[in-house]
Amino acid sequence: MSSETGPVAVDPTLRRRIEPHEFEVFFDPRELRKETCLLYEINWGGRHSIWRHTSQNTNKHVEVNFIEKFTTERYFCPNTRCSITWFLSWSPCGECSRAITEFLSRYPHVTLFIYIARLYHHADPRNRQGLRDLISSGVTIQIMTEQESGYCWRNFVNYSPSNEAHWPRYPHLWVRLYVLELYCIILGLPPCLNILRRKQPQLTFFTIALQSCHYQRLPPHILWATGLK
């Protein structure tokens, strides 16, 4: 990721920025809203050759919308070379993971990096397998940290000039919990994170249930980061 700053007027690579309040609620790991927001950039190589855009769910998931847009707006041959970075408020579901894998098989010279704010229905075996399949196909998947949030704020959000450094800082514990669960998915371990949403008041709670297999296979630094070892 190459950091760029400044108002929209000096960023011709971006067609639309989202508003600060949109970014805050879409990418807060504690928020369990149904809609998905995708911020993406395509690097075609060379100087000044980065496309940036934003997308939200329509009648299709944002991942499918992106693939259709990418393959139909202009002609792309199988030898197309580019690097794509996605910043997703939710991780891909199982069906979207399959669509992404098929897309990458048709365009073998496309590299995809995915940063996610939350794991979508992470206890569903289909979603877990889908993420593993993506990783097996060469996709890099990571949980968004403060560094990625700041990058997205500067490059995808319509912030006022005086608020360039004032992007939302989310609780580190929630980020670490999703990192923990993502490791469980990658290693083929049972889910250990359970997330509950209470309607009154509007708060999100979590519980952790570790089995012996988690202690045996999860990297110690991941357990230490969440205070579990």
Curated annotation (Swiss-Prot):
GO terms for cellular component: apolipoprotein B mRNA editing enzyme complex; cytoplasm; nucleus. Its cofactor is Zn(2+). It holds the Pfam family APOBEC4_like. Keywords: Cytoplasm, Hydrolase, Metal-binding, mRNA processing, Nucleus, Zinc. One of its GO terms (molecular function) is zinc ion binding. Expressed in the liver as well as small intestine. Belongs to the cytidine and deoxycytidylate deaminase family. This is C->U-editing enzyme APOBEC-1.
